[in-house]
Structures are given as C-alpha cells and as structure tokens.
Regions:
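C-terminal structural segment of proteins
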Residues: 1-151
C-alpha cells in the first residue's frame, strides 16, 4: 500500500489505485494531488522471504525509459508456486497486472512447460496501437523469463 502525506496528515491507498490513466485525469499519472507526497510504500508481511524478479527492456542505456518491463514476486512451497503477483509496465497507461499468468501458475511447479504457457497467455487481451506491435510478444517473453527465475 502507498502512504501519502499532505499538510502533516497521512492517508493510505492500495497500490492498485495509485496509478491512474488518462480517462481519470489526463494531467496526472498517479492519484497524487497538489501538495501530496508519497512517503512510504508498504509491502505486506506475507511477501517476506519471497523471490523477486524485475527486468526491463530499453533501447539504449539503463537510465532510459523502458519499452516494456516486468516485475514479479513469488512464494514457493514444496517445489510449487504457492502465490505470486506479476505486472508489466510500458504496455498501457498504468501498470498491467497479469492475473491470467498468476492464475495459471498458482499451485504449479516452475519449469519449461510453465514458461511456455506463461509466454502464451501473458498478452491475452492486449491490443496493440500503431507502431508498438512488438510489445505484445515482448510481454510474453519477459513473463517466461520471470517464471524461469523460479526454477
């Protein structure tokens, strides 16, 4: 969750509501309003000891904006994926939570078969705009690489 401060008062906001798209407000990318400051990002305790993965693809250098990026957190138990969250950035106005991949992987063992399936379902429902069709297969490849990190 996000902790936001304004005028000495704080409020909490779920991470899912922090990033906003142009349909909400074309002038902002986040739910922060005038004089708001993001002061904390809190991760639930249930993710302590989890495996984390992040990868970005950019045209040039590490400081460039990513064309596409992926973040994943996963907990494993007994060789199986007990729980995970996966999100992709750079593919729409807000981070895209990949619930279809999450649902596919829960309770499964990481391995080549799950990599292939993740790659296939990662971009389901995604619609390319002009000149960015390459992002759709890239989403799948990054999802597969994230899953590979669990093997």
């Amino acid at each position: 969750e996000m902790v936001i401060s304004r005028d000495g008062k704080t409020r909490k906001m779920p991470a899912e509501k922090f990033f906003i798209g142009p349909a909400t407000d074309i002038t902002r990318m986040t739910a922060l309003k005038k004089n708001d400051i993001l002061v904390e990002i809190r991760l639930p305790k249930k993710w302590a000891g989890a495996k984390y993965y992040f990868e970005k693809v950019a045209d040039r250098q590490t400081w460039d904006f990513s064309l596409v990026n992926i973040a994943m957190v996963a907990k494993t138990s007994g060789g199986k994926i007990a729980d995970l969250r996966m999100a992709c950035g750079g593919v729409q106005c807000t981070p895209r939570r990949m619930t279809n991949v999450e649902d596919l992987l829960k309770g499964e063992s990481a391995g080549a078969e799950m990599e292939k399936l993740s790659k296939r379902v990662a971009a389901q429902g995604a619609k390319a705009l002009n000149y960015n069709h390459f992002k759709i297969p890239l989403m799948g490849s990054l999802a597969a690489r994230a899953v590979r990190s669990l093997s």
